Amino acid sequence: MEENAPMTMKDIAREFGISVATVSRALKNSPRISEERRKAIQQYAREHNFYPNAIGEALRHSRVMPQRLIGVIVPEFTHYYFSSILTGIEETARARGYQIMVALSGEQYEREAQICENFHRYKVCGVIVSQAKDTKNYDHYQKLIDAGIPMVFYDRICTGVNASRVVVDDYLGAMNAVTYLIESGCKRIAFYGGPMQLEISKNRFNGYKDALLKHGIQIDESIVTLCDNRRMAEDITPKLMTLDNPPDGYFAVNDDTAIGILYTLKHAGKRVPEDVQICGFTNGQRAVACDPMLTTVEQRGHRVGEEAATILMDKVEGLSPFEKIEKRVVRTRLVVRGTTK
């Protein structure tokens, strides 16, 4: 432990050569831990000014309920999917008497780490988070978990820590979308994806890849690109159009990117879907505001938010063990509109 750094359950576990879960049980007077060991751990915690999350403990052991505050970290507010998840979290939390404190990471690791530190200081009873694109170090997550604060990831999960997670079926959603493009006549389908350190990017690419291979189509790396917003799509698409054998279909990681592709193709005189077909991934409001309306994969963000909030509150209230890792997958649905045949 660093000098002057706050004590965590992980530090106590290291001192006694036991697991964090055992420390947590001892601090809660669990009969599963011997009395001698419980007293030793509790005394050590007191001597080092360590106290479990005050709100979480009060919720589990008291009929007088203190303020119930859940910290929520969002990478960006402008994305329809994140706003729909937030709505699901807030409505589900409010129905059980909780409030949420929302913070924006802005896709930046430094801001995300500072938010986690702030949430710890504010004594939130739990944290729901979607990882920023820039995040490659996960110590700030682990510190919250070690301090006994339950955490649930949504959408962009972190495989570097053991925490519950709620995602949509990115793999199957992508595979079904690309399969539909192939069955609609596309033979060269470009993939516009996000950073590959994100699990959702990997899963959507794997769905794309497996759909092609299943239909005997080889992957062409020249039409697989990192592109996850409209501005990038408007820069990259003209370059792909100049290839000797340009794409006749595009699968984009989100609707914003797909719409960038759509308007670039239309500006170049291409007919959609007659000449080129496009599929996105979100089914937000923008999907029905473009012309033609966008074929896309519906993510059901509200349901993701509901599930994430439910998992977290069950842990806070002791209805689900702190150390239990829950993984829930929300099914997607292909919504066929005017950018495909």
Language-model features: locations:
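Hinge/beta->alpha junction and helix N-cap segments in small-molecule ligand-binding domains
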Residues: 74-84, 102-111, 156, 165-176, ...
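Short helix-capping segments at alpha-helix termini
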Residues: 95-96, 147, 212-219, 242-246, ...
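N-terminal helix-turn-helix DNA-binding module of bacterial transcription factors
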Residues: 1-66, 341
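Alpha-helical recognition/docking segments in bacterial nutrient-uptake
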Residues: 1-7, 64-179, 183, 240-242
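Short acidic capping loops at alpha-helix termini that bridge into adjacent secondary structure
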Residues: 188, 219-223, 271-277
